[in-house]
């Protein structure tokens, strides 16, 4: 009994530590007090001010554009890479797998400096393209690992049966592998989108003043105090994230039902 109470209290403390700051942020986005120290009444004026803040909205647009493009390219390349690692044997396969984990485990500052040096050597101007390439680079391994983990759960006999019946490699990929892997592909896209939207360290090294993104804009603003407009923007992003997570879960569940359940 005491152990159960201790476990319950410990879990309650963990969840409170995680979610109370988020709740405070949401509440302060509707607080008429500019400093959010105490409640002075309900208001939506901070959302109105946010809609009129051109620099913040432009940074948000840049971040959304970057996240969509980087997540899409990373998911496309990463899914095909995962299929290649799963289906084929080729020279250097262990090296490719190992390098993916190196990228995942490398500190952000190491990756940021490495990419910056690469762009300087290649003469690439810091801006949209350097930022896009960088975001694809650090999102790619997460997609590969997510999709590859799903592929490892497939029944290989299904693929062998399709091949015995005369199906080409492309047909197997299109008719069997991709439909069954689609929940993992969707999860990889959502994860890549989140990583791109959230990145500060790498982006601060590889972007230029011509293409400012939201995390860097917010970081520069909170140095002098948290603005209520930032609270409002963070609340909107939180709602969008929840919608994306729920949508991805629904898509994954529908795909699983459509394929007759998980393949063991």
From Swiss-Prot:
Segments traversing the membrane: 10-30, 66-86, 109-129, 131-151, 176-196, 232-252
Record keywords: Cell inner membrane, Cell membrane, Membrane, Transmembrane, Transmembrane helix, Transport
Leader peptide range in chain numbering: none
GO CC entries: plasma membrane
Domain of life: Bacteria
First-listed, main subcellular location of the protein, grouped into a coarse class: membrane
Classification via InterPro entries: Bact_Polyamine_Transport, MetI-like, MetI-like_sf
NCBIfam families tied to this protein: PRK09500.1 (NF007047)
Family according to the record: Belongs to the binding-protein-dependent transport system permease family. CysTW subfamily.
Protein name: Spermidine/putrescine transport system permease protein PotC
């Amino acid at each position: 009994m005491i152990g159960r109470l201790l476990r319950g209290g410990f879990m309650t403390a963990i969840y409170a530590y995680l979610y109370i700051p988020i709740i405070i942020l949401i509440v302060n986005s509707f607080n008429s007090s500019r400093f959010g120290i105490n409640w002075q009444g309900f208001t939506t004026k901070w959302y109105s001010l946010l809609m009129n803040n051109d620099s913040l909205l432009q940074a948000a647009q840049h971040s959304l554009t970057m996240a969509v493009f980087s997540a899409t390219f990373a998911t496309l390349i990463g899914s095909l890479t995962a299929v290649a690692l799963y289906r084929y044997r080729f020279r250097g396969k262990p090296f490719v797998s190992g390098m993916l984990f190196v990228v995942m485990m490398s500190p952000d500052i190491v990756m940021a400096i490495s990419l910056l040096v690469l762009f300087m050597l290649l003469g690439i101007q810091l801006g949209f393209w350097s930022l896009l390439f960088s975001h694809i680079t650090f999102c790619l391994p997460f997609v590969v690992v997510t999709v590859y983990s799903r592929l490892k759960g497939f029944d290989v006999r299904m693929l062998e049966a399709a091949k015995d019946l005369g199906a080409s490699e492309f047909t197997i990929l299109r008719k069997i592998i991709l439909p069954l892997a689609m929940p993992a592909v969707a999860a990889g896209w959502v994860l890549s989108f989140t990583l791109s939207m959230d990145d500060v360290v790498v982006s601060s090294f590889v972007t230029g003043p011509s293409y400012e993104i939201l995390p860097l804009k917010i970081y520069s603003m909170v140095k002098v105090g948290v603005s209520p407009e930032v609270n409002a923007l963070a609340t909107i992003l939180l709602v969008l994230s929840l919608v994306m997570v729920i949508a991805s879960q629904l898509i994954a569940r529908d795909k699983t039902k459509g394929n007759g359940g998980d393949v063991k």
